[in-house]
Amino acid sequence: MTNIFLCAQIYQILALNDEMLKSGCITRDEHDFVRHVQTDKLTRLHSTP
């Protein structure tokens, strides 16, 4: 998979994560955990040459 595709996938996960928190499907702790993991992945992808 290309970096562009992987980044798009991460942004979709982050958007879904936010919506799940808003609708009460997940707790704030679960939301924060997913956000932390996905932003770490995004950082690694952006720092890869």
What spans do the regions from the language model cover?
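Acidic, Ser/Pro/Thr-rich low-complexity regulatory regions
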Residues: M1-P49
